[in-house]
Amino acid sequence: MGRAIGIDLGTTNSCVAIMQGKDTKVIENKEGARTTPSIVALTSSGERLIGAPAKRQATTNASNTFFATKRLIGRQYSDPEMKNLSVPYKVFAAKSGDAWVKTTDNKEYSPSQIGAFILQNMKEAAEAYLGEEVKDAVITVPAYFNDSQRQATKDAGKIAGLNVLRIVNEPTAAALAYGLDKKHGHTIVVYDLGGGTFDVSILEIGDGVFEVKATNGDTHLGGEDFDNGVVSYLLDEFKKSNGIDLKNDPMAMQRIKEAAEKAKIELSSAMETEINLPFITADASGPKHLNMKLTRAKLESLVNDLIERTMAPCKKALEDAGLSASQIGEVVLVGGMTRMPKVIEKVKEFFGKDPHRGVNPDEVVAIGAAIQAGIIQGDVRDVLLLDVTPLSLGIETLGGVFTPLIERNTTIPTKKSQVFSTAEDNQTAVTIKVHQGERKLAVDNKLLGQFSLEGIPPAPRGRPQIEVTFDIDANGIAHVSAKDKATGKEQKIRIQSSGGLSDDEINRMVKEAEEKAQEDEKRKKFIEVKNQADSLVHSTEKSLTEYGDKVSPEDRSAIENAVNELKEVSKSDNIDDADSIQQKVTNLSQLSMKLGEAMYQASQQNSAENGFSSEGNPNDKEEKVVDSDYQDIDNKEENK
């Protein structure tokens, strides 16, 4: 078995880590950073940029730069959370009803594909570090992700060419990283406020056992919402001062969003910051600039309701665990937003103790994922992880009522069976709708899918005995099987969700990813050969200027023609022209050897004229070599 990596696929940033012996190592990306922005951009030339390069060009390519797509993964376009989505790129309803994204040239991508591009980047960083291919990975998700979101994340891993060993809840992974060396048992809370989601989990840890007692959260609450609060304030203030609404200006909106995020980060350590965006727009009177100061107090007032929203899940998690705040031994902060002083203050106020700050909130989840990978591969022993399902799983019963079969916070993996029957005489088929959630009515919960049991022998209603088994695996993903108790015939049933990616779609995306990897390799070769061509043209033209008169007119003409041909072919942006450019490079290199010979001969001639030869200075033969007298000071001192 090869090396397995742990990946934190975040809304704002992603991180990859690996076990090395008993230690963990966070792997740096190509830019030397330990985290990578979860941003993917498609350029007009067809190039795909990931991470910091994508973020740098977002202002000028906002409509084709996809960020925070983790908020779309596994979601239907009709979901209530989609209504308040504020992004510069196009989000639309795919045929399945899922929320997908679209470029300005109408190329369509599922959020799982965008996630796969980021996972591929993480995979490549690990392979560059290890010097070997990586196939296996543990990927983290918010604890409050439902079945569809977990499955969509697993699909992203498959599209990226990874075998997903396990889907792990982010707070649980953080607890693993925090408590691996803790021997004495105690209860901890992991408060995880990231870029797009909020989770809170309560765990009992000690002697290698990590048992999740309860979890809660909000999959649409995070740093993006804090940024949007600042953006709204800046837009309103600018409109008041200048009478111009910038909401429909994508480039201005992208600049303001970046400035808002930067200001938010700065105000975690400073009391005041200045936002200065020159030439943000223009009207008949000339260019307009956005220049205003933002204080920490103002920021806190803008986002206070968001911080307050994190308290209700904390309260619910404590209730589900049957604990009070005073019974919590440690509060571990995870996620970049937990650096905000107001968040720290609110957590301290709620739990009555200073939060633990001994972990890096940006890296701890990836480290925990790497530890889980080590556990699965047998590299980490004597550690038992007992996680829970965050949401109840059940079916729709008579009158549209939601009947839970597996309650939330049930330790996973778990299995529960229920016997169903027919509602009418001689009924030969039964349709079962599977839902996930906590609402009383099935329609208010997430419909995971539905399936039909067919071929039931005709009988009076209520007579057939159909045992349906609901199974949640260690990834938190649901499976269903059915058994006709009368005949003993058993059938495994796959839940066919109304949304999600089909096997054919996943296979197509895997193939596209492989083809794109080949195209990326071709593009890399194309860029390298163009750089080689530019360098050769520059050096050859310089040599022609200095030594062109040292070669025959015929040779000089041939070299000049070769230079012009290489210049012309190098203008191409078609990656398929790499071989043509390489041929011209080879041709010019061979012709330039004549120049090299002329340069060498000129160098030899200069040496001879200055009285030097390869044997040395001839005048040296006339001189006598005289050994100088010396005294050994140390010995002289000793002999005194």
From Swiss-Prot:
The keyword Secreted is annotated on this UniProt entry: no
Pfam families in the record: HSP70
Superkingdom, taxonomy of origin: Bacteria
GO MF term list: ATP binding; ATP-dependent protein folding chaperone; unfolded protein binding
Expression induction: By stress conditions e.g. heat shock.
HAMAP family named in the record: DnaK
Role description: Acts as a chaperone.
Name of the featured protein: Chaperone protein DnaK
Annotated gene: dnaK
